[in-house]
């Protein structure tokens, strides 16, 4: 367990430019604390001491803001950066060297029994606020953009963005027929669009009212 902790600290120092020392990481990185607690809880879970496992995971959630079910299967090298609001479900599987940012959910849809949560391959990056929901596989070397909602399987070496998530890159090459609504920087503002529509409608009504007034005045002058 101690050697695993040393590996986790070394991994964080390698990946996070804000990490200045092993001592700082050990004391202040909530992602490290959550994963360390998960390993203890997972041991109890695997030995069918479910209540103890859940107590450990709940205490870790209160302390870190990260909820990892002790039944989840997590490979080596997981880095949870910032971490607040991360949720990992009971039947989720995470491969080696994955990176999860704050607000990520590896959850279910409420429709499935047994295997309910996703399986992530190795070297997967899941951006902040993204949701991966359902019992499907996300391949190796996949990147999921911030706030994406993934509801279907993603092959290896792809980048997915949007709600619902769609693949925009495969093996580093852009998919040219991807729809324009996947542009998350220049997404349309629904309030602005509605105001513009109302402005057009007001102008149309003003023209119609002016036409009626002109017709009425012409009738009076006869």
Which ranges hold each PLM region?
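Terminal amphipathic alpha-helical/low-complexity segments used for targeting or macromolecular assembly
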Residues: 1-59, 175-222
């Amino acid at each position: 367990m101690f050697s695993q902790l040393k590996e986790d600290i070394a991994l964080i120092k390698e990946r996070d430019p804000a990490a200045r020392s092993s001592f700082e990481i050990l004391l202040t990185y909530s992602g490290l604390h959550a994963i360390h607690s998960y390993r203890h809880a997972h041991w109890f879970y695997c030995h069918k001491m479910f209540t103890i496992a859940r107590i450990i995971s709940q205490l870790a959630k209160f302390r870190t803001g990260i909820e990892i079910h002790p039944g989840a299967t997590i490979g080596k090298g997981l880095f949870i950066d910032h971490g607040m609001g991360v949720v990992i479900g009971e039947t989720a599987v995470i491969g080696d060297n994955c990176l999860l940012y704050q607000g990520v959910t590896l959850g279910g849809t409420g429709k499935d029994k047994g295997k309910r949560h996703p399986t992530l391959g190795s070297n997967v990056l899941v951006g902040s606020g993204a949701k991966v929901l359902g019992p499907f596989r996300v391949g190796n070397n996949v990147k999921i953009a911030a706030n994406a909602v993934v509801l279907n399987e993603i092959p290896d070496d792809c980048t997915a963005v949007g709600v619902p998530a769609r693949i925009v890159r495969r093996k580093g090459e852009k998919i040219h027929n991807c729809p324009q609504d996947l542009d998350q920087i220049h997404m349309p503002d629904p309030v602005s669009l509605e105001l513009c529509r109302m402005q057009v409608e007001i102008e149309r009504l003003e023209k119609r009212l002016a036409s009626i007034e002109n017709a009425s005045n012409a009738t009076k002058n006869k």
